[in-house]
Amino acid sequence: MDLRGRPKCYSLHLGILPFIVLVLVFFGYGFLSHKIQEFRNPGGETCMATRQTDVQKVVSVPRMAYPQPNVLTPIRNDVLVFTPWLAPIIWEGTFNIDILNEQFKLQNTTIGLTVFAIKKYVVFLKLFLETAEQHFMVGHKVIYYVFTDRPSDVPQVPLGAGRKLVVLTVRNYTRWQDVSMHRMEMISHFSEQRFQHEVDYLVCGDVDMKFSDHVGVEILSALFGTLHPGFYRSRRESFTYERRPKSQAYIPRDEGDFYYAGGFFGGSVVEVHHLTKACHQAMVEDQANGIEAVWHDESHLNKYLLYHKPTKVLSPEYVWDQKLLGWPSIMKKLRYVAVPKNHQAIRN
């Protein structure tokens, strides 16, 4: 016993305890460091498993008057409004744009919109930009990134406050398929070299379209895709995925969530860079193996979004062809629609 009546072994234990803690901390750190290294590939890049998920910032909004949400009244009972992985599917009636506008304005958000106006497709650019000024991200800061081989043909369109246009000169290709596929390469390159320093989100659209109704911050998320208007009612077996195993875009017939349109996708600059870089690398590998995916960059986009689930999915309101599909009652609004054209004349 010591002078305070405690057993000597008890005092000994108290003396050893700090040493044991130090040993455990040291070896625990080494173990965790080893595990962290296991999540990195041989090239030193962090594996997808360690990437940050879509964490929406919590911002303080001002007092606002708006209808109270009712937990017993579905916002839409005629369509799916959430994916199985709990990503929202954006339809008219599923969001309050006033609340969202306040949230994104308080974050001082800047949105980039990329569009490719190559060869004869430059004729669609004026209508694209004019309608974007009317309907796209109204009230927010926007940078239009126009990729073109004809910079002198880019029209002068009056832009609102906080909005500007940047012309990026790129080469053209003989085949329209190559023009389409090289979009991924260009977006990937400029995301790394420029976009990440200038904008918070990227939206990638087709130039032979026009905005016909509101397209705003409700679409913004870490990674979003848009349901293809021709397949939103179809079963996965009917999707026009790439079905040849030789291609990097191959998807088996028993897999698939949705069929996404190649003409409208986006997200944070980081996630768009990951997507476009992966698709470009897959297309390069296909080319080396003498195969071209059935729907080119769209096929690779669908493969990517199958295994990298988007954090938000846009309904076909955001890509529509009224001439081919009419205006079904389920579509409360048609927001981004195809412009009638002669594909053969434009592509050749």
From Swiss-Prot:
<keyword id="KW-0808">Transferase</keyword>
<keyword id="KW-0325">Glycoprotein</keyword>
<feature type="binding site">
    <location>
        <position position="298"/>
    </location>
    <ligand>
        <name>an alpha-L-fucosyl-(1-&gt;2)-beta-D-galactosyl derivative</name>
    </ligand>
</feature>
<dbReference type="GO" id="GO:0030259">
    <property type="term" value="P:lipid glycosylation"/>
</dbReference>
<comment type="function">
    <text>Possesses strong A transferase activity and weak B transferase activity.</text>
</comment>
<keyword id="KW-1133">Transmembrane helix</keyword>
<feature type="active site" description="Nucleophile">
    <location>
        <position position="298"/>
    </location>
</feature>
<comment type="pathway">
    <text>Protein modification; protein glycosylation.</text>
</comment>
<dbReference type="GO" id="GO:0005794">
    <property type="term" value="C:Golgi apparatus"/>
</dbReference>
<dbReference type="GO" id="GO:0004380">
    <property type="term" value="F:glycoprotein-fucosylgalactoside alpha-N-acetylgalactosaminyltransferase activity"/>
</dbReference>
<feature type="binding site">
    <location>
        <position position="228"/>
    </location>
    <ligand>
        <name>an alpha-L-fucosyl-(1-&gt;2)-beta-D-galactosyl derivative</name>
    </ligand>
</feature>
<keyword id="KW-0735">Signal-anchor</keyword>
<dbReference type="GO" id="GO:0006486">
    <property type="term" value="P:protein glycosylation"/>
</dbReference>
<feature type="binding site">
    <location>
        <begin position="116"/>
        <end position="118"/>
    </location>
    <ligand>
        <name>UDP-N-acetyl-alpha-D-galactosamine</name>
    </ligand>
</feature>
<feature type="topological domain" description="Lumenal">
    <location>
        <begin position="33"/>
        <end position="348"/>
    </location>
</feature>
<dbReference type="GO" id="GO:0004381">
    <property type="term" value="F:fucosylgalactoside 3-alpha-galactosyltransferase activity"/>
</dbReference>
<keyword id="KW-0964">Secreted</keyword>
<feature type="binding site">
    <location>
        <position position="206"/>
    </location>
    <ligand>
        <name>Mn(2+)</name>
    </ligand>
</feature>
<feature type="binding site">
    <location>
        <begin position="206"/>
        <end position="208"/>
    </location>
    <ligand>
        <name>UDP-N-acetyl-alpha-D-galactosamine</name>
    </ligand>
</feature>
<dbReference type="GO" id="GO:0046872">
    <property type="term" value="F:metal ion binding"/>
</dbReference>
<dbReference type="GO" id="GO:0005975">
    <property type="term" value="P:carbohydrate metabolic process"/>
</dbReference>
<comment type="similarity">
    <text>Belongs to the glycosyltransferase 6 family.</text>
</comment>
<dbReference type="GO" id="GO:0016757">
    <property type="term" value="F:glycosyltransferase activity"/>
</dbReference>
<dbReference type="GO" id="GO:0032580">
    <property type="term" value="C:Golgi cisterna membrane"/>
</dbReference>
<feature type="binding site">
    <location>
        <position position="240"/>
    </location>
    <ligand>
        <name>an alpha-L-fucosyl-(1-&gt;2)-beta-D-galactosyl derivative</name>
    </ligand>
</feature>
<feature type="transmembrane region" description="Helical; Signal-anchor for type II membrane protein">
    <location>
        <begin position="12"/>
        <end position="32"/>
    </location>
</feature>
<dbReference type="InterPro" id="IPR005076">
    <property type="entry name" value="Glyco_trans_6"/>
</dbReference>
<keyword id="KW-0328">Glycosyltransferase</keyword>
<dbReference type="GO" id="GO:0042742">
    <property type="term" value="P:defense response to bacterium"/>
</dbReference>
<feature type="binding site">
    <location>
        <position position="321"/>
    </location>
    <ligand>
        <name>an alpha-L-fucosyl-(1-&gt;2)-beta-D-galactosyl derivative</name>
    </ligand>
</feature>
<dbReference type="Pfam" id="PF03414">
    <property type="entry name" value="Glyco_transf_6"/>
</dbReference>
<dbReference type="GO" id="GO:0005576">
    <property type="term" value="C:extracellular region"/>
</dbReference>
<feature type="glycosylation site" description="N-linked (GlcNAc...) asparagine">
    <location>
        <position position="108"/>
    </location>
</feature>
<protein>
    <recommendedName>
        <fullName>Histo-blood group ABO system transferase 1</fullName>
        <ecNumber>2.4.1.40</ecNumber>
        <ecNumber>2.4.1.37</ecNumber>
    </recommendedName>
</protein>
<keyword id="KW-0479">Metal-binding</keyword>
<keyword id="KW-0812">Transmembrane</keyword>
<keyword id="KW-0333">Golgi apparatus</keyword>
<keyword id="KW-0472">Membrane</keyword>
<feature type="binding site">
    <location>
        <position position="208"/>
    </location>
    <ligand>
        <name>Mn(2+)</name>
    </ligand>
</feature>
<feature type="topological domain" description="Cytoplasmic">
    <location>
        <begin position="1"/>
        <end position="11"/>
    </location>
</feature>
<keyword id="KW-0464">Manganese</keyword>
<dbReference type="InterPro" id="IPR029044">
    <property type="entry name" value="Nucleotide-diphossugar_trans"/>
</dbReference>
